[in-house]
Amino acid sequence: MATLKDIGVSAGINILTAFIFFIIFAFLRLQPFNDRVYFSKWYLRGLRSSPASGGGFAGRFVNLELRSYLKFLHWMPEALKMPERELIDHAGLDSVVYLRIYWLGLKIFAPIAMLAWAVLVPVNWTNNELELAKHFKNVTSSDIDKLTISNIPEGSNRFWAHIIMAYAFTIWTCYMLMKEYETVANMRLQFLASEGRRPDQFTVLVRNVPPDPDETVSELVEHFFLVNHPDNYLTHQVVCNANKLADLVSKKTKLQNWLDYYQLKYTRNNSQIRPITKLGCLGLCGQKVDAIEHYIAEVDKTSKEIAEERENVVNDQKSVMPASFVSFKTRWAAAVCAQTTQTRNPTEWLTEWAAEPRDIYWPNLAIPYVSLTVRRLVMNVAFFFLTFFFIIPIAFVQSLATIEGIEKVAPFLKVIIEKDFIKSLIQGLLAGIALKLFLIFLPAILMTMSKFEGFTSVSFLERRSASRYYIFNLVNVFLGSVIAGAAFEQLNSFLNQSPNQIPKTIGMAIPMKATFFITYIMVDGWAGVAGEILMLKPLIIYHLKNAFLVKTEKDREEAMNPGSIGFNTGEPQIQLYFLLGLVYAPVTPMLLPFILVFFALAYVVYRHQIINVYNQEYESAAAFWPDVHGRVITALIISQLLLMGLLGTKHAASAAPFLIALPVITIGFHRFCKGRFEPAFVRYPLQEAMMKDTLERAREPNLNLKGYLQDAYIHPVFKGGDNDDDGDMIGKLENEVIIVPTKRQSRRNTPAPSRISGESSPSLAVINGKEV
């Protein structure tokens, strides 16, 4: 169990580590050869060019201006200068609202921390319960635990202070959540009203198109929307299964990179000896061949395969999926279609807003809609087992990441680890580092599971993965660490007391686990966030590409991939800190300052990254905010329930029942916010759509909208390549055509002429009129 000294050692090491990271970053960002890495967003926007530094040849690589090194922390105030409105124009609403999550954490926990330290810390400190428990009940504790609720004796009237503070914390948190929800909802509506024209504003994704023996999918979609949306339908683009073609294109890109590498190597060496490669595993074994000739042949072979596969996709109706992107003449019409049921059979002609083209995850559009339910059921079961079986290794690793655990596994290290500094280092750092390393591959696993489920947009994939990551953190990182840690640390006490005393021991031990979370926050939230700004992985990849693949300035531009925020990993991390802060605020207030440092540091670091580095892959107009709000509410309810359970073990029978109202109030508040603000995030108001359409018609009366939308939702592998014969894949309707193409013999429900029959079938009214 970490002591105050251990916490101090851990804090010193993590602060020093963060400071070193900032110094290294300050040096690297000033060097001209790193400029594209640390200011990549400005290069992508065409607003920055390679810095011209004096000093001749050396000045191209090293910044020789010594005065610039004296302002190594100047980037911090610079990151805070850009106004929010300008930042939205620069980086998008998603990035700005993501930053507001950190700001929300500061607004919630700063007043809570001051109130908790002013009221609860004196109440907890001025007792001697833990001293008595240490002597008479053999319960392990340290001086730092005297600041927790565990130091208050059972049945004490002092628990009223914690109950009153729980109400105060809940009211303040709910108030800030409501204000923030209202602000973000207004920002979203204003952003949607002011943003420029985008293809997704006019387009819906139609899925589960029913099969028809007489018409192709394209003809059927065209006919259905000409009949049911005759005044508003504009064009459509059927979805095809181009996954194999995309794999071939990706393979060709990799082969071309190797060819560029060997050609560049041969040219730069000025040697008559041509580069050699081996055909075996990873080029380490097998027959030796001329590398340049080999990769030229492989690229040519793959190009032929791509051409053949492209023809198959274009001409084979089996590659056409029962889905289509349908575009309308107005945003109003698209909103009506996306938000209504199209037929009396609710399982067919399913419509939803189309994601913007860059947000589409194209491989999943080829998944049959009928298989999605089974896929999601399988992944839910897999996630259940992943979550709950992960508790065992996490508990085991954490049990070893202690002095007692190491001495048990490796007794020969006892002499070393019993030294004061080494002991403090282990107690203050090892458990947090072990947990962080244990979770390093989890985001990739969860993202793979989300992709298997078949979601069609990158934004929704990230939100789904973030949701699962949050649940995993809740069950394993929080509950698993608390329960397993308490059980291991109090094992001796568990074995030497009657069973009815065990809940009391757990109730006393849970607040003590705050010391572990303090060390974890410093490792993950202090040093980890500071390390984010270094961007070591993108930096290394850029320089490797620059050294071995870059031949032109365009190659140099493509060599840098700045990445994006990473909502699927960043948001669950933030939510873990919300959970820890709300749970431990009335129990162990000492944890709150560490959380405040995280929120403040992360806000500055990520604001800098959003301004200078990250290039967001999509823009969802803050559609993720209901998830953020819901998870903070979940954390608030968990904190209330745990406090009720904790007071129950403390025999605070007269005070504990007064907490029952808190979850009820919180759930009622959540339902109010859900009804009041959530519609702005799941539906597009028809009034807003009509206003935007009216303004656009007034400003651009001659806009060729069909030309703008015609190719917006073509699969990326058909754009910019050779032999792009995708004419059969694009709707060729003209605005004036009102004829409905069909191969059917009868069309009694079609109010427009058929190309086959030459005239429309008589309506029921006409038939009745003739009979009369």
Swiss-Prot record:
Lineage: Eukaryota, Viridiplantae, Streptophyta, Embryophyta, Tracheophyta
Keywords: Calcium, Cell membrane, Glycoprotein, Ion channel, Ion transport, Membrane, Transmembrane, Transmembrane helix, Transport
GO molecular-function terms, A-Z: calcium-activated cation channel activity; mechanosensitive monoatomic ion channel activity; monoatomic cation channel activity
One Pfam family in the UniProt entry: PHM7_cyt
A GO CC annotation given for this chain: cytosol
Phenotype upon loss of function: Impaired osmotic Ca(2+) signaling in guard cells and root cells, and attenuated water transpiration regulation and root growth in response to osmotic stress.
Ranges for region Disordered: 743-772
Entry protein name: Hyperosmolality-gated Ca2+ permeable channel 1.1
Outcome of substituting residue 340 to A: Prevents the formation of homodimer
Glycosylation: residue positions: 138
Activity regulation information from UniProt: Activated by mechanical pressure.
Taxonomic source organism: Arabidopsis thaliana (Mouse-ear cress)
Family annotation (PANTHER family): PROBABLE MEMBRANE PROTEIN DUF221-RELATED (PTHR13018), PROTEIN OSCA1 (PTHR13018:SF93)
Similarity annotation: Belongs to the CSC1 (TC 1.A.17) family.
Documented effect of changing residue 59 to R: In osca1-1; defect in the perception of hyperosmolarity
Signal peptide: none
Topology term for the membrane: Multi-pass membrane protein
Record's function text: Acts as a hyperosmolarity-gated non-selective cation channel that permeates Ca(2+) ions. Shows the following permeability sequence: K(+) > Ba(2+) = Ca(2+) > Na(+) = Mg(2+) = Cs(+). Mechanosensitive ion channel that converts mechanical stimuli into a flow of ions: activated in response to membrane stretch and poke.
Bias (Polar residues): 748-763
